Amino acid sequence: MKKVVVITGATDGVGRALAKILSKEYDLALCGRSDEKMDALLDELGDCHVYHECFDITDDHRRHAFGEHVKAEFGTVDVVVNNAGANTKKDKVTDINLSDLRYMFELNCVSAIGIVQEFYPVMKEKQSGLFVNILSTCCLFHNPMTGGYSASKDAMEGISKILLKEVKADNIGVCN
């Protein structure tokens, strides 16, 4: 029985590349926003066991439904890659629209916490698992015009460090 890897933001960039690489050895549960991009990715993956849904990861109800569907499809989850995210608005900190800032936090941090909450109970029950939270070099460099994005990714970095301490006793790993 193959291990199961969940990848959010699977239709572009890092998520897409991971799906292509991991599909050779793992069963996959993928989510992204674009039906067209997901269909193209599924064509590239060929004959492997993939469950997929397209939705906005910031939608609490859809995210929860995805978690329930994945657990029903596979019965377990071994690795979760929190990859969904974007720099949706480049602006000076003094000029950033607070609605844009809130959305970046929802997309880059809060939704990842929601995904952790969906799959943690499965990992805890079997005393095994790994959460991989994809961050950004912005956590190192904090460049101008990336205040909202950098802050949201920095928040996720902090959450990851705390999460590691909280789930370590359950034999669950966390890395960035």
Predicted segments, located by residue:
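Conserved glycine-rich cofactor-binding loop
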Residues: T11-D12
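Conserved glycine-rich Rossmann-like NAD(P)H-binding loop of the short-chain dehydrogenase/reductase
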Residues: E25-A40
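The beta1-alpha1 cofactor-binding region of Rossmann-like NAD(H)/NADP(H)-dependent oxidoreductases
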Residues: C54-A65, L98
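Substrate-binding pocket helix/loop in short-chain dehydrogenase/reductase
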Residues: D91-V93, D100-R102
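Active-site loop immediately N-terminal to the catalytic Tyr-X3-Lys motif
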Residues: V93-T94, F141-G147
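Active-site helix of classical SDR
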Residues: V116, S152
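Residue(s) in the substrate-gating loop at a strand-loop-helix junction
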Residues: S136
